[in-house]
Amino acid sequence: MRVAFSAVVFLAGGFAAEAAETHYPLTLKNCGRDVTFKQAPTRAVSVGQSSTEILYSLGLGDKVVGTAVWFGPVLKGFEEVNAKVKRLADNDPSFESVLAEKPEIVTADFQWHVGPMGIVGKPEQFEELGIPTYTSPSDCVGKDNSGGGDGVRTAPFRMEIVYQEITELAEIFNVQDRGEKLVAELKAREAAAREKIGSTNGKLSAMVWFSSTQIDADPYAAGKFGAPAYILAALGIKNVIESEEEWPTVGWETIAKSNPSMIVAAKLDRRRYPADDIAVKHQFLEGDAVTKLMPAVSSGHVFDMDAQSMSTSLRVIEGIETLAADIAASDLNK
């Protein structure tokens, strides 16, 4: 049974004596910039659900005074913590709304929000007001954001970059003990999920379907550099999509020819496109002339996964656990 990270980490008791204290001023390299913290922040605004959930997982919910950019419900176990924190916006907050909370740090998931072309604000704008910013390394390392938008990933995502974010945020807030314990817990959970299905011997393959602009349009499928590719690789599963794009559109005829052992379908709370609805995804797969003949569909090997687990965040581990459990309960690895 999974429990809220903070329940394990924040109550870690005697573990604190083993971790070093942060010495201020602390200077870190973040997304190509030197960022200096004069002291542990007491007021944080997090512009991004992943960043928010990491702060909560480090037991820092009482330091978060505002959040924004939500894709779905908060990580299970943090409902009460999150209910006490002001939500500045479900999507993009304004620069002024962030400043109104008098933050001592602004964290962000994406440079699209806080970066050289940030639509919320540029790091320099905040720093001129004495507010340091910290953007998730997973949006900078092995990724080119110079073209704006979602950017282009240039190297495969690895969980180590999330562990770097956890470790650095723990250092910034002087809670290194919690950071060390959280990273250790996540690594142990990934190892346990791998063990659950043992060796797949390279015999399994998958296609990960995020959504489609129209239900009969080419689907957005996970390429080989994003978080879903890491989930598959962690379990020894081949990704049939070879594109270096993070979410390329690929025709169903092409996917059918690659004959994946399974289809992993994203569950989204948003309803931007009809295919965001997981029920609509299943109806399409079972009714379309091409997809209904795919062995993955006819054999019942279409597995649901929370879309948040497909983001470059600590929820990737939950995605690995979910898929491992689905495979273990099926006849795929027998």
Residue ranges and their predicted role:
Residues 17-53, 155, 171-209, 327-334:
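Bacterial Sec-exported substrate-binding components of ABC uptake systems
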Residues 28-32, 86-96, 139, 244-251:
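Short helix-initiation/N-cap motifs at beta->coil->alpha
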Residues 43-116:
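A short, structured surface patch at a secondary-structure boundary
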Residues 50-53, 70-73, 105-106, 111-116, ...:
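Solvent-exposed loop/turn segments at secondary-structure junctions
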Residues 73, 113-121, 131-168, 201-227:
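Extracytoplasmic ligand-binding site segments that recognize negatively charged/polar headgroups
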Residues 156-165, 264-334:
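Structured C-terminal subdomain patch of bacterial secreted/periplasmic proteins
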